[in-house]
Curated annotation (Swiss-Prot):
Function: Allows the formation of correctly charged Gln-tRNA(Gln) through the transamidation of misacylated Glu-tRNA(Gln) in the mitochondria. The reaction takes place in the presence of glutamine and ATP through an activated gamma-phospho-Glu-tRNA(Gln).
Keyword Metal-binding carried by entry: no
Keywords carried by this UniProt record: ATP-binding, Ligase, Mitochondrion, Nucleotide-binding, Protein biosynthesis
Gene, per the UniProt record: Qrsl1
Family annotation (NCBIfam families): gatA
Catalytic reaction annotation: L-glutamyl-tRNA(Gln) + L-glutamine + ATP + H2O = L-glutaminyl-tRNA(Gln) + L-glutamate + ADP + phosphate + H(+)
The organism of origin for this protein: Rattus norvegicus (Rat)
GO cellular component: glutamyl-tRNA(Gln) amidotransferase complex; mitochondrion
The protein's name: Glutamyl-tRNA(Gln) amidotransferase subunit A, mitochondrial
Length: 525
């Protein structure tokens, strides 16, 4: 049951094949069994069981709230959850109990979803590995998969070479990949949903900016932050998006126009579409395996009758630097609220002045990565630097936006790109580089989309020669999220990404792949 799609489980609940309480207990048991992944910061067992009980009553009365009623979900720990600790994986917010739910959380709960817990992340979502939070790093479930152990000859008991999940929403990606929930919320500022989705073999969707409310998402970069969605298939993403999308009076950046339900065709058709391949994304650092899969994917579209053309995004080479300036500048502004007076941790050290209290509180509350980004942002915002850095970066951002406008205006429907440079790497290799360097490397294909406010989705396509997931990214026009997901659904059906084989789960029957074996895929190595 845990290996089924959200829609399939919803159907099973409606037909009485399983109850919400039984399903909830299965997921809670699996969360405990996979605790070594460190995917969750808080497991809300009592809350989830109570919600399951209420869902069960509705099913018995024939009053199901919809496809999400009784479905276990998880939420990244930078979304406010009423009465449930929300920490952003930081000492600054340890013990913080929000008095309200983020809008996206409330919309899930209003549809009967079961909140299994809050997932791990990089501190304040600043990172690309989910390794820098105060609660420790998240481990990629594929580290313990049969596919990886066999192809890389890793000892099942050897834990020194475990793989990162990507970040910053690595806990949500791991939670979905390990079957502890059927969907999870992440956040995406420069790729924080798509990056871990690629490394963990899940669908990771970033909606158009303004389609989904940010109210209750503890801000990192207000002009780029978007709630993201993790699921194990594109249809499930569409179901969740249909619940989350729409105007929110508490978030003035959300669209006012009514949003139609996100319904994808059962048999998607991409013939006649124009698929763009950005030539600037063919960088030397891109692994040969991903490069090959990218080319094969383009061939699949062409074989189906789509027109595949090379396109130019000329300002791509400036995007990482531009993103860094704008990101850290907004970080410095947003983090200023954590001062020991209004929000978060307050230093217990006896201080002689307010300034000293600020300094001690922030020294104790933030890790070095967060402090480093605050320092960078404050530098760019200094009066003598403002024009040369921040204002120029805003102008470059406009040029990057115009690049996408020109490409989509020329008749291109969707862009096809890599999501990451490489497959997931071992933790010991990842930490050889500092957080700033790693983030610049890992955001290379993803952050420009955030600056342009476009929808994008990672689709897992194949396993590498080492048995690890590789994903590709599809980018759509602004507010053409449904078209993008339709194309993604077609692509997903073509590649037939294999089911992860976690031996611990196979042994006790918690998860059995269809027909007891993996599905063969169209993209091979």
């Amino acid at each position: 049951m845990l290996g089924r799609t959200l829609r399939e489980v919803s159907s099973a609940l409606k037909q009485g094949h399983i109850t919400p309480t039984e399903l909830c207990k299965k997921c809670l048991s699996l969360i405990k069994k996979t605790k070594y992944l460190n995917a969750y910061i808080t497991v809300s067992e009592e809350v989830a069981l109570k919600q399951a009980e209420e869902s069960e009553k509705r099913y018995k009365q024939g009053q199901s709230l919809g496809d999400l009623d009784g479905i276990p979900v998880a939420v990244k720990d930078n979304f406010s959850t009423s009465g449930i600790e929300t920490t952003c994986a930081s000492n600054m917010l340890k013990g913080y109990l929000p008095p309200y739910n983020a809008t996206v959380v409330q919309r899930l709960l209003d549809q009967g979803a079961l909140l299994m817990g809050k997932t791990n992340l990089d501190e304040f979502a600043m990172g690309s590995g989910s390794t820098d939070g105060v609660f420790g790093p998240v481990k990629n479930p594929w580290t313990y998969s049969k596919q990886y152990r066999e192809r890389s000859r890793q000892d099942a008991q050897e834990d020194s070479h475990w793989l990162i999940t990507g970040g910053s929403s690595g806990g949500s990606a791991a939670a979905v990949a390990a079957f502890t929930c059927f969907a999870a919320l992440g956040s995406d500022t420069g790729g924080s949903t798509r990056n871990p989705a690629a490394h963990c073999g899940t669908v990771g969707f970033k909606p158009s900016y303004g389609l989904v409310s940010r109210h209750g998402l503890i801000p990192l970069v207000n002009s780029m932050d978007v709630p993201g969605i993790f699921t194990r298939c594109v249809d499930d993403t569409a179901i969740v998006l249909g619940v989350l999308a729409g105007h929110d009076p508490k978030d003035s950046t959300t669209v006012n126009d009514p949003v139609k339900p996100t319904t994808l065709p059962s048999v998607p058709d991409v013939s006649g579409l124009c698929i763009g391949i950005p030539k600037e994304y063919l960088v030397p650092e891109l692994s040969s395996e991903i490069r090959s899969l990218w080319s094969q994917a383009a061939d699949l579209f062409e074989a189906e009758g789509a027109r595949v053309i090379e396109v130019c995004l000329p300002h791509t080479c400036y995007s990482i630097v531009c993103y860094h300036v704008l990101c850290t500048s907004e970080v410095a502004s947003n983090m200023a609220r954590f001062d020991g007076l209004q929000y978060g941790h307050r230093s217990a050290v006896d201080m002689s002045s307010t300034e000293a209290l600020y300094a001690a509180t922030r020294q104790e509350g933030f890790n070095d990565v967060v402090k480093g980004r605050i320092l960078s942002g404050n530098f760019f915002l200094l009066k003598e630097n403002y024009e040369n850095y921040f204002v120029k970066a805003q102008k470059v951002r406009r040029l990057i936006v115009n690049d996408f406008v020109n490409v989509f205006g020329s008749g291109v429907d969707v862009l096809l790109t890599p999501t990451t440079l490489t497959q997931a790497v071992p933790y010991l290799e990842f930490i050889k580089e500092d957080n700033r360097t790693r983030s610049a490397q890992d955001d290379i294909f993803t952050q420009a989309v955030n600056m342009a406010g476009l929808p994008a989705v990672n689709v897992p396509v194949a396993l590498s020669s080492q048995g690890l997931p590789i994903g590709l990214q599809l980018i759509g026009r602004a507010f053409c999220d449904q078209q993008l997901l339709t194309v993604a659904k077609w692509f997903e059906k073509q590649v037939q990404f294999p089911v992860i084989q976690l031996q611990d789960l196979m042994d006790d029957g918690s998860l059995v792949p269809e027909n007891g074996k993996l599905t063969s895929g169209s993209l091979t190595q």
